């Protein structure tokens, strides 16, 4: 039962990361000033 909990937790983390990636892409497309520095770093991360 414990392993099942870890699997669910892992899936939730992956989904959250994917959602973050989508938000980052949208923000970068909008060229939000606050995100400009993060977007520069984000380009080097293969999503």
From Swiss-Prot:
Membrane topology: Single-pass membrane protein
GO biological process, any: negative regulation of phosphorelay signal transduction system
Keyword tags: Cell inner membrane, Cell membrane, Membrane, Transmembrane, Transmembrane helix
Keyword Transferase: no
GO cellular component: plasma membrane
Localization (cell): Cell inner membrane
Transmembrane segments: 6-26
Superkingdom of the source species: Bacteria
UniProt key word Transmembrane helix: yes
Pfam families, per database record: MgrB (PF13998)
Function: PhoP-regulated transcription is redox-sensitive, being activated when the periplasm becomes more reducing. MgrB acts between DsbA/DsbB and PhoP/PhoQ in this pathway. Represses PhoP/PhoQ signaling, possibly by binding to the periplasmic domain of PhoQ, altering its activity and that of downstream effector PhoP.
Assembly and binders: May form homooligomers. Probably interacts with the periplasmic domain of PhoQ.
Recorded family membership: Belongs to the MgrB family.
Protein name: PhoP/PhoQ regulator MgrB
Naturally occurring in which organism (per UniProt): Salmonella dublin (strain CT_02021853)
